[in-house]
């Protein structure tokens, strides 16, 4: 087994016996075989595009299946077997279309002609392809490092592309680049500089993917507005939705109208409460339950209703709640209820709804607690004049973007302590599940501006970027000259994509933790440090002094 795509890799050197995420070596190998098959599909789509043949089915399929191979998304080996069959079927169909149009015979590469042996172990075939990929790439470990960076980055981009496509937002340029990046992984003629440029291109395309997703969310559900979200359960029956997929949350809300259920969010669906159309249309869209993904074994066990996981992060479920757990879309786990989608991409949630209605629900009202969400780019930039005036008056000294992924490894208390120690004349912007280290802290206000502003989900890094660019334009300086520091945490491949976007934009002085990626070699890290001053976190006190100097 070889996997080092997430932050919690064993001893910081990659997982070689069993995934720290709970992924078995067999699932890892079948996932890698799927990626190999996608690498073979990619050159076929590139040729099809040249000939004007539609690749939409292949593009959407690639987005979903790359998403499924991300950390804590899908552990179901049989689903990957099906994906591999579908991949080969789509590839051969495109080949047939190409051959009907092409004026000369096409000579396909080995990877594009590969045929898995479905009567033999796919896991073993995946291991063989892993070894070949590693052996062909390790003549230059720095190039191999950047190849992995590109692969993990496009996995993150694919997840945002998948969600945007669900909401009707697509861009041929995004699809085409994902295929080009996959095809490039089998090229051995590219230099280190070429791979740096491809990695930065991932960042550029990921920015567009996040923009599409932002457009999908805001045109469908309205621009987020500051909203008070209850954290205290309410007496009555409920159903819990975890993950990131706001379209699926909206579908569940529609299917639970007049059912006598309160709908609670979990994890990164907290920011969904800021979308005005959801709050206005669905009065049973009540509150938020629990904290970050790594606490789900406790949160899910205690929740007295059904739980639907729409995306990552899914942990191997505990027997205390596996019967009331449901997965959808690219998410899966062996033995757990899976709700398949109709031709519009929406599951029938009846089984989950019936499960919740049979359960006791919350028997009492808990003491009121709440947090605020909804400070996305539209909200913040609408008060930019007020912000600028406060900066000029010295009321606001500095902005900190403290966000990213949360995780279970030690060292993440750094982010809690950092935010607690931020001076009272500074604003903290946050996003993604890293916020759960401090999301309920009462930091007060500067004037009528809250000192802690929740920008949204991990994909709402786009919102944070728009805020930074908007403030830079207003102050007539570059983003790097703003009184702004980025203190980021990472865990999985979406964070890799977002980091590449920030580097593509030329943003410097980012502090990253709690540990640096295992797939980044010392030479690549040196390049990032020298070019962008990317640096690891140290201690909250030391980093605060440096940021405010």
Swiss-Prot record:
Cofactors needed by this protein, per the record, are: [4Fe-4S] cluster; hybrid [4Fe-2O-2S] cluster
What does the record say about how the cofactor binds?
Answer: Binds 1 [4Fe-4S] cluster.
Q: In the UniProt record, does the keyword Metal-binding occur?
A: yes
Enzyme class (EC, first level): oxidoreductase
Locate the Cysteine persulfide modifications and list their residues. 405
Keyword entries, A-Z? 4Fe-4S, Cytoplasm, Iron, Iron-sulfur, Metal-binding, Oxidoreductase
**Main localisation:** cytoplasm
Q: Which reaction does it catalyse?
A: A + NH4(+) + H2O = hydroxylamine + AH2 + H(+)
Q: Give one Pfam hit by family name.
A: Prismane
EC number of this enzyme: 1.7.99.1
Task: List the CDD domains hit by this protein, alphabetically.
Answer: HCP
Mind listing the GO biological process terms from this record? response to hydrogen peroxide
Its family?
A: Belongs to the HCP family.
The role this protein plays is: Catalyzes the reduction of hydroxylamine to form NH(3) and H(2)O.
Q: Which NCBIfam families match?
A: hybrid_clust, PRK05290.1
What name is this protein filed under? Hydroxylamine reductase
Q: What is the scientific name of the source organism?
A: Crocosphaera subtropica (strain ATCC 51142 / BH68)
